[in-house]
UniProtKB/Swiss-Prot annotation:
Keywords assigned: Ribonucleoprotein, Ribosomal protein
Name of protein: Large ribosomal subunit protein bL33
Gene giving rise to this polypeptide: rpmG
UniProt record similarity statement: Belongs to the bacterial ribosomal protein bL33 family.
GO cellular component: cytoplasm; ribonucleoprotein complex; ribosome
Gene3D superfamilies xref list: Ribosomal protein L33 (2.20.28.120)
Top-level taxon: Bacteria
Species this chain originates from: Solibacter usitatus (strain Ellin6076)
GO biological process: translation
InterPro entries: Ribosomal_bL33, Ribosomal_bL33_CS, Ribosomal_bL33_sf, Ribosomal_zn-bd
Length: 50
């Protein structure tokens, strides 16, 4: 199965808030998105972690 589950971590408070899937064969670099962090209560950058 080429798609793997990834987790996104808030860059400010380091909480793991979101999960998603990605194809690691076509997208080798780590993703970064702006999403709403419930703990910070504002939009923050979220980076992909293992």
């Amino acid at each position: 199965m080429p798609r793997d589950i990834i987790t996104f971590q808030c860059t400010e408070c380091k909480n793991r808030n979101y999960t998603s899937t990605k194809n690691k064969k076509t997208t080798t670099e780590r993703l970064e998105m702006k999403k709403f962090c419930r703990h910070c209560r504002k939009h923050q950058g979220h980076k992909e972690i293992k």
